[in-house]
Swiss-Prot record:
The lineage of its organism: Bacteria, Pseudomonadati, Pseudomonadota, Gammaproteobacteria, Enterobacterales. Overexpression of ramA in the SL1344 strain confers multidrug resistance and also tolerance of both hexane and cyclohexane. This is Transcriptional regulator RamA. Disruption phenotype: Deletion reduces transcription of various genes, including acrB, porins ompC and ompX, and some pathogenicity island genes including invF, sipC, sopB and ssrA, in the SL1344 strain. Reduces growth in the presence of various phenothiazines, including amitriptyline, chlorpromazine, sanguinarine, and thioridazine. Intolerance of hexane. No significant effect on adherence of mutant SL1344 strain to mouse-derived macrophages. It comes from Salmonella typhimurium (strain LT2 / SGSC1412 / ATCC 700720). Keywords: DNA-binding, Repressor, Transcription, Transcription regulation, Virulence. The keyword Transmembrane does not apply. Residues 9-107 form the HTH araC/xylS-type domain. SMART domains: HTH_ARAC. It comes from the Bacteria. One of its GO terms (biological process) is regulation of DNA-templated transcription. Residues 26-47, 74-97 bind DNA.
Length: 113
């Protein structure tokens, strides 16, 4: 494994451990000790997706799980994963899952209960 691949694996682990934080690309790059441009190029090279997309999709998957597994309010889940606002969270969630968070919870609960 190359040093660059090890760096990306370490960063992925750190990201996964800190998904409840805002996690701006600048912050991730600073943690890695790379410029954001270089880190984004490395990430794309080794993971095949952008760093921003990886962080967003990981947060959304965890939020979707929380919608199904907890009774937490959508607003609380939005804050838990560091989204700037419930409006932003709802827009991105809806784009990803084709349903707003509340409807996603109702539809998926209807299928499992």
């Amino acid at each position: 494994m190359t040093i660059s691949a090890q760096v990306i694996d370490t960063i992925v682990e750190w990201i996964d451990d800190n998904l409840n934080q805002p996690l701006r690309i600048d912050d991730i790059a600073r943690h890695a000790g790379y410029s954001k441009w270089h880190l984004q190029r490395l990430f794309m090279q080794y993971k095949g997706e952008s760093l921003g997309r990886y962080v967003r999709e990981r947060k959304l998957k965890l939020a979707a799980r929380d919608l199904l597994d907890t009774d937490q309010k959508v607003y609380d889940i939005c804050l838990k994963y560091g989204f700037d606002s419930q409006q932003t969270f709802t827009r991105i969630f809806t784009r990803t899952f084709n349903l707003p968070p509340g409807a996603y919870r109702k539809e998926k609960h209807g299928r499992t209960h």
